[in-house]
């Protein structure tokens, strides 16, 4: 890009993953909070950030929180991922449309050049991992997920945390939607499939919960 006479502007999608998956700091995470990636994804994002900051491009780095998919039909995921994080871990999401707005507006924002910005939904989008999972299950017509299905840890585990998005919101004015809008949009995307999901709710919920590798042990310990 540096050799191109025209392609000089770069808005890079980084991730909260660069902060690692241990919530051992007081929220919210700020742009200058020390990073500590704990997996290859986070380390790769951090390496990209470092290379971009050393370049001569007109760059902006947007560190994005979780943006749940609106269209779930055909979306493949491993249920075990849901349970690998502490149920009481802090989580801030963002509606995908708001995330798109942030990136689109960053392209033309002169004040954003040379800056790292946290991109999240704001205070109205702050919750816990377990609560958010159950809200998403509810939007699909299944669940809820039992607390015993989630890993138990001494320190909260989740990638990222609640975020300081004051500067990004001031520059980009993108935080418009919250949990209500997210659930409405998800239900609309389900369309005619929704009644079938509700009919099969017990079976689907059972299938998701059985993917937890922690459920049996947590219930054993809880009953002992």
Feature locations, PLM:
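Conserved Rossmann-fold NAD(P)-dependent oxidoreductase catalytic core, especially the SDR/UDP-sugar
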Residues: 1-38, 62
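Structural signature of the Rossmann-like NAD(P)-dependent dehydrogenase/reductase core
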Residues: 9-12, 60-66, 92, 118
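Short-chain dehydrogenase/reductase
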Residues: 27-46, 89-97
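A short C-terminal helix-loop "cap" of Rossmann-like NAD(P)-dependent dehydrogenase/epimerase domains
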Residues: 31-34, 67, 71-87, 138-149
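Conserved beta-loop-beta element that borders a ligand/cofactor-binding pocket
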Residues: 49-71
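Glycine-rich "substrate-gating" loop/helix at the edge of Rossmann-like oxidoreductase active sites
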Residues: 65-71, 85-97, 121-125
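Substrate-positioning beta->alpha
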Residues: 84-108, 114-115
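Mid/C-terminal beta-alpha module of Rossmann-like enzyme folds, strongest
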Residues: 102-171, 177-185, 193-201, 207-224
């Amino acid at each position: 890009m540096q050799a191109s006479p025209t392609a000089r502007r770069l808005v890079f999608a980084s991730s909260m993953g660069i902060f690692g998956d241990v919530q051992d700091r007081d929220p919210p995470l700020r742009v200058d909070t020390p990073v500590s990636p704990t997996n290859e994804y986070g380390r790769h994002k951090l390496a990209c950030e470092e290379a971009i900051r050393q370049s001569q491009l007109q760059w902006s780095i947007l560190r994005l929180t979780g943006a749940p998919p609106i269209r779930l039909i055909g979306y493949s995921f491993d249920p075990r991922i849901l349970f690998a994080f502490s149920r009481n871990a802090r989580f801030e999401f963002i509606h995908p449309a708001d995330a798109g707005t942030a990136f689109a507006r960053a392209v033309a924002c002169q004040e954003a050049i040379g800056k790292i910005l946290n991109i999240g939904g704001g205070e109205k989008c702050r919750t816990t991992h377990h609560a958010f999972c159950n809200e998403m299950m509810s939007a699909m017509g299944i669940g809820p997920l039992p607390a015993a299905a989630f890993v138990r840890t001494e320190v909260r585990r989740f990638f990222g945390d609640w975020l300081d998005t004051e500067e990004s919101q001031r520059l980009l004015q993108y935080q418009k939607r919250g949990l209500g809008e997210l659930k409405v949009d998800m239900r609309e995307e389900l369309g005619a499939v929704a009644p079938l999901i509700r009919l099969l709710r017990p079976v689907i919920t059972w299938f998701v919960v059985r993917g937890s590798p922690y459920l049996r042990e947590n219930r054993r310990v809880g009953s002992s």
